[in-house]
Amino acid sequence: MSILDNTILFVKENLQNAEAGHDWFHVERVYKNALLIANAEDCNLEIVKLGALLHDIADSKFHNGDETIGPKLAREFLESQKASEEVISHVVNIIENISFKGGNFEKKFTSNELDIVQDADRLDALGAIGIARTFNYGGFKNRPLYLPNIAPNLHMTKEEYKNSEAPTLNHFYEKLLLLKDKMNTETGKKIALERHKFMENFLSQFYAEWEGGK
């Protein structure tokens, strides 16, 4: 089998018991998004595919905040597949730099391939799927839906963002609604804008229902 086929099997096996917002189906959606975006970008498609498939192989949220496990697993797997060091290091850099970590985070590595995979991942945090994933994770962490007296914190450090226990609805303001202005590619920006509008409409409906209207 090809390295791509083996990577798919590896990811499916490792994520078979993952939280629903970060499972194989999330990875598959990101993979499809990445292929769509890559059609309009100058990139190494093999690195885009591998980066998309391996980007959440060990999300730090589910490993006590340890950000080294995912890159380590990816490197070990790609080495077992006899991938070149150039490909391995690039994919590892994508995994290390893809995540949103609060408003003050700057990427330490840049490439067209990272831009594509990052946009693909961010798109899955937007729109209807993004809303579903957000409330699924909030339920997983046993967080309240909304507490009117707890305002969103838009200026969190990386550590504050990672350790936040805020109500689920705050996440829209602390991350999701910020993403459309953080997209890297023209294709990503266009899709993000439509999904952003969907979320704004959802929030308007949510608040109306919270107050007993509509």
Label for each model-derived stretch:
Residues 18-48, 60, 69, 73-81:
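Alpha-helical phosphate/pyrophosphate-handling elements in metalloenzyme active cores
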Residues 81-118:
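Hydrophobic, well-structured mid-protein blocks that either form specific transmembrane helices
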Residues 45-62, 70, 91-101:
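His-Asp-centered metal-binding catalytic motifs of divalent-metal-dependent phosphohydrolases/nucleases
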Residues 6-17:
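Generic N-terminal amphipathic, Lys/Arg-enriched alpha-helix
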Residues 15-24, 28-41, 54, 103-214:
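Divalent metal-dependent phosphate-bond-processing catalytic cores, especially two-metal-ion Mg2+/Mn2+ enzymes
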Residues 1-2, 214:
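Basic/polar N-terminal segments that are highly enriched at the extreme N-terminus
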